[in-house]
Swiss-Prot record:
Signal sequence, renumbered to the chain: none
Quaternary context: Homodimer.
Broad EC category: transferase
Name of the molecule in the record: 8-amino-7-oxononanoate synthase
Catalytic activity of the protein: 6-carboxyhexanoyl-[ACP] + L-alanine + H(+) = (8S)-8-amino-7-oxononanoate + holo-[ACP] + CO2
Positions bound to pyridoxal 5'-phosphate: G108, F109, S179, H207, T233
GO biological process: biotin biosynthetic process
GO molecular function: 8-amino-7-oxononanoate synthase activity; pyridoxal phosphate binding
Keyword Transferase included in the entry's annotation: yes
Length: 384
């Protein structure tokens, strides 16, 4: 088989399964409205959960940062790319979340890959929730360590896997709020079992940070859990992009020596760090509380109105509200019908989710209004 035949076969298989991904160029993709092909849609696909992507103070902070620092960092943080703006953001994040140190990364994917690649050796074992994000599972699969997956949120199964003899160290990996189901991991129980087996816990709280918990500190804070490794990202609740790893001082020093994504990647622009500092300030103050409270009300309104639809509504109290449709083609058709009626939604299909669980991944944000939720419900009931 030639290279071209290999590529064609893979694409043909995706098309046959109604699983071929495609991108839509949009004029605006975050916030309450999505604009594409000169048409405006109510946007129920964005991860901009607090509606901060268009916040004037955050935009102004980025603009002022670009004027002060330029539009790029100029290099890796190990050379010339670690600015006073990066340092200030790291210190503010560490203080906010109660850790000694924070290290910035260009994306959550990079952060997860970097930590696992740097921490794990052949004699070690990763025990991961089987529904963990692709970045976590891919990093675990590529690492030299053993990978075992436990049934989603099943602490008993986790304990059984941890009890199996391991010559090295064990790292338990999970999300805080799961990206495709919207449910929250039982972190207190997971941490207890992990500690009983002398393991470390790594939590990717991409979809919880900024959005839930006191001052938006996320799912770990909400459950009074402090994992050894906490990954937070800035493309969701913060409304920007990037990520950070929260950890002890010694682990931070270790990652600075051995995390190749840090050493060999150009760091985020200092102007972006300034925007993230402004976003964090909004998240922590009363305005952040008001946005989170509004989001909770919108979620309650949606869940109350969707109960009698002929779809499975995931057990989620987060901004992620998946409607499980099942069949790939049906999910695609339903998403298209909703778009035709002014609601932009995304059909998520395998391999992103398990086979037979194709869904509409609906996301609600604080930028929405109650009438937006009512319109979504009206359209869903008309196509159920």
């Amino acid at each position: 088989m030639s290279w071209q035949e290999k590529i064609n076969a893979a694409l043909d298989a995706r098309r046959a399964a109604d699983a071929l991904r495609r991108r839509y160029p949009v004029a605006q993709g975050a916030g309450r409205w999505l604009v594409a092909d000169d048409r405006q849609y109510l946007n129920f696909s964005s991860n901009d959960y607090l509606g901060l992507s268009h916040h004037p103070q955050i935009i102004r902070a980025w603009q002022q940062g670009a004027e002060q620092f330029g539009v790029g960092s100029g290099g890796s943080g190990h050379v010339s790319g670690y600015s006073v703006a990066h340092q200030a953001l790291e210190e503010e994040l560490a203080e906010w979340l109660g850790y000694s140190r924070a290290l910035l990364f260009i994306s959550g994917f990079a952060a997860n890959q970097a930590v696992i690649a740097a921490m794990m050796a052949k004699e070690d074992r990763i025990v991961a929730d089987r529904l963990s994000h692709a970045s976590l599972l891919e990093a675990a699969s590529l690492s030299p360590s053993q990978l075992r997956r436990f049934v989603h949120n099943d602490v008993t199964h986790l304990a059984r896997l941890l009890a199996s003899p391991c010559p090295g160290q064990q790292l338990v990996v999970t999300e805080g709020v799961f990206s495709m189901d919207g449910d929250i991991a039982p972190l207190a129980e997971i941490q207890q079992v992990t500690q009983q087996h002398n393991g470390w816990l790594m939590v990717d709280d991409a979809h919880g940070t900024g959005v839930i918990g006191e001052q938006g500190r996320g799912s770990c804070w909400l459950q009074k859990v402090k994992p050894e490794l906490l990954v937070v990202t800035f493309g969701k609740g913060f409304g920007v992009s990037g990520a950070a790893v929260l950890c002890s001082s010694t682990v931070a020093d270790y990652l600075l020596q051995f995390a190749r994504h840090l050493i060999y990647s150009t760091s985020m622009p200092p102007a972006q760090a300034q925007a993230l500092r402004a976003s964090l300030a909004v998240i922590r103050r009363d305005e952040g509380d008001a946005r989170r409270e509004k989001l909770v009300s919108l979620i309650a309104r949606f869940r109350a109105g969707v109960q009698d639809l002929p779809f499975t509504l995931a057990d989620s109290c987060s901004a992620i509200q998946p409607l499980i449709v099942g069949d790939n083609s049906r999910a695609l058709q339903l998403a298209e019908k909703l778009r035709q009626q002014g609601c932009w939604v995304t059909a998520i299909r395998p391999p992103t989710v398990p086979a037979g669980t194709a869904r509409l991944r609906l996301t609600l944000t604080a930028a929405h209004e109650m009438q937006d939720i009512d319109r979504l419900l009206e359209v869903l009931h008309g196509n159920g």
